[in-house]
Amino acid sequence: MEQLAQRVEDLEMKLAFQESTIDVLDQQVIKLNDLLAEQQHQLRVLISKLQSVEPSNMATQAEETPPPHY
């Protein structure tokens, strides 16, 4: 009977450790989710800024005439 009590106690300790680990991992997932949301917001802002930039008045490489020595 004492062996059964020891096994139950071991299982309870393992369960408590697993619950603690799950709580820690859950907090990490929440932090990473918040970080991802912030990065997505920053990316949307950056894309918006890039789209609003005036195009350059310089010709593209395909539009450039070759130098005279060609």
Curated annotation (Swiss-Prot):
Belongs to the SlyX family. It comes from the Bacteria. This is Protein SlyX homolog. PANTHER family: PROTEIN SLYX. It holds the Pfam family SlyX. Signal peptide: none annotated. Gene3D superfamilies: 1.20.5.300.
